[in-house]
A protein has these predicted regions:
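Alpha-helical "hinge/linker" immediately C-terminal to small N-terminal DNA-binding modules
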Residues: 1-28
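Short amphipathic alpha-helical coupling segments at ligand-binding clamshell hinges
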Residues: 1-8, 46, 50, 146-147, ...
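Flexible hinge/capping segments at coil-to-helix
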Residues: 27-28, 98-139
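Central regulatory/effector-binding core of bacterial HTH transcription factors
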Residues: 31-93, 270
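Short, well-ordered beta-strand segments
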Residues: 33-37, 85, 135, 181, ...
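Hydrophobic hinge/microswitch elements
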Residues: 69-73, 78-81, 88, 142-198, ...
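Secondary-structure junction motif
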Residues: 88, 119-123, 131-154, 220-229, ...
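Beta-alpha-beta core module
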Residues: 94-107, 121, 168-217
Length: 272
């Protein structure tokens, strides 16, 4: 209830400012407002790249970004306090919210480290990661589950020296050499420049997948449309398989457990 009151108050104050500007003869070009929910499993560097195209629309845009858990964001989405939610997993069909998953794209994982670790573990990757110091996302995240499954399939058990809720904090510790760390492949160039790290290896089959979730079957808000179009055509253009492009949008509640990439039964969105 408090968030609803806050949003209405914000709109009232904006209208008040517009009224004052009109009375004083100032231009009143009120920007289009979009409220975006960002699931806390989405790296902030990815979220920024997803949202940025919405700021390049012909008309002015004012964005409000709210980070939170799946439960919080879906509750707000269901009563239209949010225009769209950005998530790293689709909404599960068991969730009693009439919403739709719009696939933005997917990317493999890059394994990075400081030069000392690169020299030690690049040769023979990925089996070289046996007993290597590793920084990991928390075990309840989609990317951690996918990473654990991949390592187990290779019979590789690194030595976990740190677990983090926040991917940016994980990368900060990786930058000081605490351990090998992974990141979405689409961020590799950015992280190499930012942290002066290097690639140890990469795992294109360990996918991080990103979705826009809305109460609409077809996105209508111009900012949400811009986010989806740019993600598919630019950010994830080389990482989105043809099969995913043919089935980008799915109603969440009616999907069966075995249905395609639009939903992951192993990692339902509320648990990610």
């Amino acid at each position: 209830m408090g968030q609803v009151v806050y949003r209405y108050a914000d709109e009232i104050f904006a209208l008040g400012r517009e009224l004052v500007d009109t009375a004083r003869g100032r231009p009143t070009g009120r920007p289009m407002h979009v409220v975006i929910g960002v699931h806390d499993g989405v790296p902030k560097s990815i979220a920024r790249r997803l949202i940025e195209p919405a700021l390049s629309l012909p008309e002015p845009v004012r964005i409000t970004c709210r980070e939170g858990s799946a439960e919080q964001l879906l509750a707000d989405l269901s009563v239209q306090r949010l225009d769209v939610v950005l998530a790293d997993a689709p909404i599960a069909p068991t969730v009693k919210v009439r919403a739709y998953n719009h696939l933005l794209g997917e990317t493999g994982l890059s394994f990075l480290g400081v030069p000392r670790l690169v020299r030690k573990y690049r040769s023979g990757f990925p089996t070289s990661l046996r007993d290597a110091p590793m920084l990991m996302p928390m075990s309840n995240t989609t990317v951690r589950r996918n990473l654990d499954q991949w390592l187990e399939s290779l019979d590789v058990r690194p030595r976990v020296v740190g677990e983090f809720d926040d991917s940016e904090l994980l990368w900060e510790f990786g930058a000081i050499g605490l351990g090998v760390f992974s990141a979405p492949l689409v961020l590799e160039t950015h992280l190499v420049r930012l942290y002066n790290v290097q690639r140890i290896g990469w795992a294109p089959s360990v996918l991080s997948t990103f979705y826009a979730i809305s109460v609409e079957r077809k996105l209508k808000h111009p900012a949400a449309v811009a986010i989806c179009d740019a993600a598919r055509s630019t950010l994830f253009a080389k990482n989105t398989p043809t099969s995913s492009r043919r089935a980008r949008t799915r109603p969440a509640p009616s999907r069966r457990a075995a249905a395609g990439r639009e939903r992951s039964a192993a990692s339902p969105f509320p648990q990610g």
